[in-house]
């Protein structure tokens, strides 16, 4: 008797194929119904695919900017989309940076004119340097930053070196040039971190407050709040219109900054300038607008050989330190803010802005503008949404427009610019709280920097005294191992400076 072979469970569970299923449909009605359903499913799938493709094409057409290909390439080089920004935000950020730093083209020429330089020519040089340096930062650094002569370096040149008769202006510009070259070489060879390690942390943190004290002192002196007495400084005439306007400007400026009002510096300068017209402080002579004055008397007016004297080493270091640490802090702050706000992994190379800054220092000295640096007020652009160098280009364009207003800048009184100088200086002094007060061997050198700067009215000499005091205090405390070998190399030059100055 033949037995049937058992069927495999796999074969029994396998579904029927399409051909067997169609053959199983005996009646024509069922066969026709199957093909109708198949056509409906295919039509529905085709409709879905077509709608998805149409939507993607429509999205591409909507997101594509309506600009020419050449203009698209120029704008695309900034990486606006990669950093999470738009062209509108970049424009707003550029205007914000301009309003936050426009006071420089008024304050700095006034400070340099106190040293005997022609105000109109200096104003032209400063505006040109600010516009070109800021544009270079936008094109090559691709960061929203404004470059302008720093108040600390300008104060050192105008009041310590030139006005006190220590050196002439070409020699001072030579010092600025060599400090910029040192900054450039350190950036090219990548040894910025080595220099930062040589200078003690307490001295680095005291450099900013020392510059702030010196800047505030300059503001008090220019406003007549402080005058030279028979043996020391004395209180000026507080009842004079200039002193009253300065004090009023300081109070208003502090209130505006506390409320984070944009363009507070410009508001105070314009308000006091207008109020000063009936008080006789503002003198309007001639048309407020016109062609800028020729800067030919300041162009390439520089002494590169005479500025290399060993006696000027502390001043060279003062220029370098103020430029180096100021630029480093601002660049790192702005780049970190951009990275956190954009929420992108795009790496921002800080080497390029350092190259632009150091090159601008050298170029500025050739144009008669000392110590070009990256301004901390550039953070206003990052706060306004600026992420790329396009913001810097907008700010540079605004500064270039100011060239036709150089006669108006000469009419602004010192009572209008002094509040800005005082508030900026006091704000920088607030950084002294970061110094470690638990270790006297670190605290005392920082205090020496501030006290010597205030007593001698020279933050270059104050920094030199702090560096020399650091070595002496560490040796006396038995902590000579904390001294970097580079400090031992600098010590003989510092000793020579004080012996020569005695």
Model regions and ranges:
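Low-acidity, Ser/Thr- and Arg-rich intrinsically disordered low-complexity segments
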Residues: 3-24, 31, 47
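Helix-loop-helix hairpins and the membrane-proximal interhelical loops
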Residues: 58-121, 234-235, 269-351, 495
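Helix-loop-helix junctions within the multi-pass membrane cores of secondary transporters/permeases
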Residues: 71-108, 129, 149-159, 163-208, ...
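Loop-to-helix transition at the N-terminal end of transmembrane alpha-helices
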Residues: 116-135
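Juxtamembrane transmembrane-helix boundary signature
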Residues: 131-151
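Membrane-embedded alpha-helical modules
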Residues: 165-278, 393-502
């Amino acid at each position: 008797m033949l037995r049937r072979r058992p069927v495999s469970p796999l074969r029994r569970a396998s579904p029927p194929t399409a051909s067997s299923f169609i053959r199983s449909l005996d009646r024509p009605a069922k066969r026709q119904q199957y093909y109708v359903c198949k056509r409906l499913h295919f039509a529905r799938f085709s409709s879905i695919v077509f709608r998805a493709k149409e939507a993607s094409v429509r999205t591409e057409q909507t997101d594509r900017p309506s600009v020419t290909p050449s203009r698209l390439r120029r704008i695309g080089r900034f990486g606006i989309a990669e950093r999470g920004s738009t062209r509108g935000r970049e424009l707003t950020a550029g205007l914000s940076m301009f309003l936050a730093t426009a006071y420089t083209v008024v304050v700095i020429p006034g400070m340099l004119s106190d040293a005997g330089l022609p105000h109109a020519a200096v104003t032209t040089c400063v505006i040109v340097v600010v516009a070109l340096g800021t544009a270079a930062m936008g094109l090559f650094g691709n960061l929203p930053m404004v470059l302008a002569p720093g108040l600390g370096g300008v104060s050192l040149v105008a009041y310590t070196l030139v006005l006190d008769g220590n050196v002439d202006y070409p020699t001072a510009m030579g010092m600025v040039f060599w400090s910029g070259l040192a900054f450039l070489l350190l950036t090219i060879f990548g040894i910025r971190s080595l220099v930062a390690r040589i200078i003690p942390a307490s001295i680095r943190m005291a450099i900013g407050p020392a510059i702030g004290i010196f800047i505030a002192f300059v503001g008090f002196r220019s406003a007549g709040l402080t005058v030279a007495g028979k043996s020391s400084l004395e209180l000026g005439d507080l009842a004079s219109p200039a002193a009253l306007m300065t004090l009023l400007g300081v109070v208003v400026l502090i209130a505006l900054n506390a409320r984070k009002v944009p363009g507070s510096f410009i508001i105070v300068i314009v308000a006091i300038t207008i109020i000063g017209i009936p008080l006789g402080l503002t003198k309007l002579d001639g048309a407020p607008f016109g062609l800028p004055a020729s800067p030919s008397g300041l162009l390439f007016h520089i002494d590169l050989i005479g500025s290399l004297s060993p006696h000027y080493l502390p001043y060279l270091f003062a220029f370098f330190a103020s430029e180096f640490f100021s630029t480093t802090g601002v660049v790192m702050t702005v780049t970190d803010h951009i990275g956190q706000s954009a929420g992108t992994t795009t790496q921002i190379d800080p080497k390029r802005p350092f190259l632009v800054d150091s090159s601008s220092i050298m170029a500025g000295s050739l144009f008669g503008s000392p110590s070009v640096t990256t301004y901390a007020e550039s953070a206003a652009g990052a706060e306004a949404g600026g992420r790329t160098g396009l913001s810097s280009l907008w700010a540079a364009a605004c500064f270039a427009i100011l060239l036709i207003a150089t006669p108006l800048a000469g009419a602004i009184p010192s009572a209008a610019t002094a509040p800005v100088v005082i508030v900026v200086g006091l704000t920088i002094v607030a950084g002294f709280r970061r110094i470690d007060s638990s270790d006297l061997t670190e605290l005392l050198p920082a205090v020496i920097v501030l006290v010597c700067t205030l007593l001698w009215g020279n933050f270059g000499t104050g920094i030199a005294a702090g560096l020399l005091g650091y070595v002496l205090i560490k040796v006396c405390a038995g902590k000579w191992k904390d001294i970097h070998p580079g400090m031992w190399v600098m010590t003989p030059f510092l000793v020579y400076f004080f012996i020569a100055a005695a």
